[in-house]
Protein backbone atom coordinates (compact mmCIF):
# COMPACT_ATOMS: atom_id res chain seq x y z
CA UNK A 1 0.00 0.00 0.00
CA UNK A 2 1.38 3.41 -0.97
CA UNK A 3 1.93 5.89 1.79
CA UNK A 4 2.48 9.65 1.67
CA UNK A 5 5.47 10.83 3.61
CA UNK A 6 5.40 14.26 5.17
CA UNK A 7 8.54 16.17 4.32
CA UNK A 8 9.77 19.32 6.05
CA UNK A 9 7.46 22.26 5.47
CA UNK A 10 8.76 24.94 3.15
CA UNK A 11 8.14 28.63 3.74
CA UNK A 12 8.06 30.02 0.22
CA UNK A 13 8.03 28.56 -3.25
CA UNK A 14 7.68 30.79 -6.28
CA UNK A 15 4.07 30.78 -7.42
CA UNK A 16 4.92 30.56 -11.12
CA UNK A 17 5.72 26.85 -10.73
CA UNK A 18 2.59 25.53 -12.44
CA UNK A 19 1.51 22.34 -14.24
CA UNK A 20 2.28 22.32 -17.95
CA UNK A 21 5.91 23.43 -17.69
CA UNK A 22 8.09 21.26 -19.95
CA UNK A 23 11.84 20.61 -20.19
CA UNK A 24 13.42 18.63 -23.03
CA UNK A 25 17.08 17.65 -22.84
CA UNK A 26 19.25 15.48 -25.08
CA UNK A 27 22.10 13.43 -23.61
CA UNK A 28 24.77 11.31 -25.29
CA UNK A 29 25.02 7.89 -23.65
CA UNK A 30 28.47 6.92 -22.35
CA UNK A 31 30.15 3.71 -21.20
CA UNK A 32 29.42 4.67 -17.58
CA UNK A 33 25.71 4.41 -18.45
CA UNK A 34 25.84 0.85 -19.77
CA UNK A 35 24.17 -2.21 -18.31
CA UNK A 36 27.37 -3.76 -16.93
CA UNK A 37 25.90 -7.24 -16.50
CA UNK A 38 25.41 -7.56 -20.27
CA UNK A 39 28.17 -8.51 -22.68
CA UNK A 40 27.15 -5.70 -25.05
CA UNK A 41 27.15 -1.96 -24.52
CA UNK A 42 23.48 -1.23 -23.89
CA UNK A 43 22.08 1.80 -22.01
CA UNK A 44 20.95 0.76 -18.52
CA UNK A 45 17.62 1.32 -16.80
CA UNK A 46 19.20 3.04 -13.76
CA UNK A 47 21.00 5.46 -16.10
CA UNK A 48 17.76 6.23 -17.95
CA UNK A 49 15.96 6.90 -14.67
CA UNK A 50 18.84 9.13 -13.57
CA UNK A 51 18.53 11.21 -16.75
CA UNK A 52 14.78 11.47 -16.23
CA UNK A 53 15.25 12.64 -12.65
CA UNK A 54 17.95 15.09 -13.71
CA UNK A 55 15.67 16.60 -16.34
CA UNK A 56 12.95 17.07 -13.70
CA UNK A 57 15.49 18.79 -11.42
CA UNK A 58 16.50 21.11 -14.29
CA UNK A 59 12.85 21.85 -15.10
CA UNK A 60 12.06 22.83 -11.51
CA UNK A 61 15.30 24.60 -10.54
CA UNK A 62 14.56 28.05 -12.01
CA UNK A 63 11.31 28.21 -10.02
CA UNK A 64 12.89 27.57 -6.61
CA UNK A 65 14.19 30.05 -4.10
CA UNK A 66 17.83 30.15 -2.98
CA UNK A 67 17.46 27.75 -0.03
CA UNK A 68 15.20 25.28 -1.83
CA UNK A 69 15.91 22.06 -3.70
CA UNK A 70 13.88 19.07 -4.75
CA UNK A 71 14.34 15.49 -3.60
CA UNK A 72 12.98 12.43 -5.35
CA UNK A 73 10.18 10.60 -3.54
CA UNK A 74 8.84 8.12 -6.12
CA UNK A 75 9.73 6.65 -9.50
CA UNK A 76 7.41 4.54 -11.68
CA UNK A 77 9.14 4.05 -15.04
CA UNK A 78 9.07 1.47 -17.85
CA UNK A 79 12.21 0.77 -19.91
CA UNK A 80 10.72 -0.44 -23.18
CA UNK A 81 13.52 -0.73 -25.73
CA UNK A 82 17.32 -1.04 -25.85
CA UNK A 83 19.63 1.80 -26.85
CA UNK A 84 23.27 1.34 -27.81
CA UNK A 85 25.95 3.25 -25.93
CA UNK A 86 26.97 6.25 -28.01
CA UNK A 87 23.42 6.99 -29.16
CA UNK A 88 21.65 10.12 -27.99
CA UNK A 89 18.69 9.94 -25.63
CA UNK A 90 16.17 12.77 -25.48
CA UNK A 91 14.23 13.10 -22.23
CA UNK A 92 11.03 15.11 -21.91
CA UNK A 93 9.74 16.02 -18.45
CA UNK A 94 6.40 17.74 -17.91
CA UNK A 95 5.17 19.01 -14.57
CA UNK A 96 1.68 17.54 -14.11
CA UNK A 97 0.76 18.56 -10.58
CA UNK A 98 1.80 20.85 -7.74
CA UNK A 99 0.29 20.09 -4.31
CA UNK A 100 1.98 22.17 -1.63
CA UNK A 101 5.61 21.11 -1.81
CA UNK A 102 4.83 17.88 -3.72
CA UNK A 103 5.45 17.75 -7.47
CA UNK A 104 4.39 15.11 -10.01
CA UNK A 105 5.95 14.78 -13.46
CA UNK A 106 5.42 12.78 -16.64
CA UNK A 107 8.71 11.60 -18.16
CA UNK A 108 9.54 10.05 -21.53
CA UNK A 109 12.78 9.06 -23.23
CA UNK A 110 13.49 8.45 -26.92
CA UNK A 111 16.68 7.46 -28.70
CA UNK A 112 18.20 9.23 -31.70
CA UNK A 113 16.28 6.92 -34.03
CA UNK A 114 13.08 8.47 -32.67
CA UNK A 115 12.11 5.27 -30.85
CA UNK A 116 10.44 5.70 -27.47
CA UNK A 117 12.57 3.76 -24.99
CA UNK A 118 10.96 4.68 -21.68
CA UNK A 119 8.12 6.49 -19.96
CA UNK A 120 6.54 6.92 -16.59
CA UNK A 121 5.80 9.14 -13.63
CA UNK A 122 8.16 10.74 -11.15
CA UNK A 123 7.45 12.57 -7.89
CA UNK A 124 9.65 15.06 -6.10
CA UNK A 125 9.25 17.28 -3.05
CA UNK A 126 10.55 20.80 -2.55
CA UNK A 127 12.58 21.07 0.65
CA UNK A 128 14.24 23.90 2.53
CA UNK A 129 17.95 23.02 2.51
CA UNK A 130 18.58 24.96 5.73
CA UNK A 131 16.21 22.68 7.66
CA UNK A 132 16.21 19.38 5.77
CA UNK A 133 17.56 16.55 7.93
CA UNK A 134 17.84 18.73 11.04
CA UNK A 135 14.92 17.44 13.11
Regions found by a protein language model. Give the residues of each.
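A structural signal for short, well-ordered beta-strand segments
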Residues: 23-29, 75-79, 93, 107, ...
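Catalytic strand-loop segment that frames the active site of acyl-thioester-processing enzymes
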Residues: 7-44
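A cross-taxon signal for low-complexity, glycine/charged-rich
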Residues: 1-4
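Hydrophobic beta-strand-centered segment that forms part of the acyl-chain substrate-binding groove
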Residues: 57-90
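Conserved N-terminal beta-strand and adjoining loop/helix that marks the start
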Residues: 45-49
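HotDog/MaoC-like acyl-thioester-processing domains
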Residues: 19, 85, 95-135
